[in-house]
């Protein structure tokens, strides 16, 4: 690759942005500059990788992309922990995917072909895996099993965590609304289920491991059956989707500026999309009351949800109307789990070697 030294760095970045994620891994050893580039948030956001949906049935996992037509691809499952699926949940951790099972979880980067099995704590209570927090390539898993627990990826150890919060009476609506943004976890919380003024976002950070009230929401749920889903917009801000159970009206709000993780007081929400046409689908099925998954692509809203028979659908909305709806026919098993995911270059964190752990303890 000596001839590449004569190319402008901007051109090298453009070339590399078109290389598939799995192929980029081998180029980390070319130079320190290249290795640093693959960890750079701007490069990752500009890389030709777009949002897609991950769907998991009892026997298979699929990637569903929209570029520009819907493409369904079955993902290989020859990795430890996923030989037999039987998943309880899929958790999108921004850069990694967590596949939750009864007896633990698999942290997985499907595009790099890397995975790691996370054994649950010795407590025999079922664990709810909420997501991953990180800082400077150090990672922790946040879970709940009667009390909050923190798993350290480096030491491979679970720690019971005494919950600290600025408002201990705040309840989490749904653990699936947890969102990972730049290393922190955020939840939609409420004081009264059907009081829109009581809804806000709680944050759990890596450094202090404390739950704090972060910012208010522009609206809440008026009915128990309303869809209310927090998401990530443009890689550094929030989005919030709501669908009214009664009118079927869909609203999407986004934050105007990048999220300042130290202070949520300056968060300003604005209406980004509104859909109120009569043919809008029900995004929350009435059988299992599961929230939809969604992402924003340009001026389009792309949603994945299940109908009342358990079949998966992709809805594309834009220009104040429903543009298309497509049933994913090849996903045969009903009631698939689903979440959004962006193919990433982030490796699955490995445990420290014994020598490194000894140095950390010193």
Curated annotation (Swiss-Prot):
Coiled coil: none annotated. Residues 1-47 form the F-box domain. InterPro entries: F-box-assoc_dom_typ1, F-box-assoc_interact_dom, F-box-like_dom_sf, F-box_dom, Quinoprotein_ADH-like_sf, SCF_F-box_component. SMART domains: FBOX. It comes from the Eukaryota. Pfam families: F-box (PF00646), FBA_1 (PF07734). This is F-box protein At2g14710. It comes from Arabidopsis thaliana.
């Amino acid at each position: 690759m000596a001839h590449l030294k004569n190319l402008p760095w901007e051109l090298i970045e453009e070339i590399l942005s078109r290389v598939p994620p799995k192929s980029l891994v081998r180029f980390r050893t070319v130079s320190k500059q290249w290795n640093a580039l693959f960890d750079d948030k701007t490069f990752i956001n500009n890389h030709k990788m777009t949002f897609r949906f991950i769907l998991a049935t009892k026997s298979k996992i699929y990637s569903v992309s929209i570029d520009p037509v819907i493409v369904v691809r079955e993902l290989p499952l020859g990795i430890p922990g996923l030989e037999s699926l039987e998943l309880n949940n899929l958790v999108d951790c921004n850069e990694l995917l967590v596949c939750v099972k009864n007896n633990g979880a698999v942290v997985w980067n499907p595009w790099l072909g890397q995975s790691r099995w996370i054994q649950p704590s010795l407590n025999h209570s079922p664990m709810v895996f909420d997501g991953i927090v990180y800082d400077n390539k150090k990672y922790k898993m946040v879970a709940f099993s009667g009390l909050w627990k923190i798993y350290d990826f480096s030491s491979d150890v679970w720690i019971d965590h005494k919950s600290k919060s600025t408002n201990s009476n705040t309840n989490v609506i749904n653990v699936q609304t947890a969102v990972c943004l730049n290393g922190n976890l955020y939840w939609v919380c409420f004081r009264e289920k059907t009081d829109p003024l009581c809804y806000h976002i709680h944050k759990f950070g890596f450094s202090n491991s404390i739950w704090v009230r972060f910012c208010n929401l522009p609206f809440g749920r008026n009915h128990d059956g309303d869809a209310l889903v927090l998401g990530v917009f443009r890689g550094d801000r929030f989005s919030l989707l709501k669908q009214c159970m009664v009118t079927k009206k869909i609203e999407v709000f986004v934050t105007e500026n990048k999220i300042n993780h130290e202070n949520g007081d300056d968060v300003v929400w604005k209406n980004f999309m509104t859909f109120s046409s009569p043919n809008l689908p029900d995004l929350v099925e009435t059988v299992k009351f599961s929230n939809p998954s969604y992402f924003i692509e340009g001026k389009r809203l792309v949603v994945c949800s299940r109908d009342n028979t358990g079949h998966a659908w992709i809805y594309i909305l834009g220009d104040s109307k429903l543009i298309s709806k497509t049933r994913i026919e090849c996903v045969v098993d009903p009631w698939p789990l689903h979440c959004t995911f962006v193919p990433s270059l982030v490796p699955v964190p490995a445990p420290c070697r014994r020598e490194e752990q000894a140095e950390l303890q010193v």
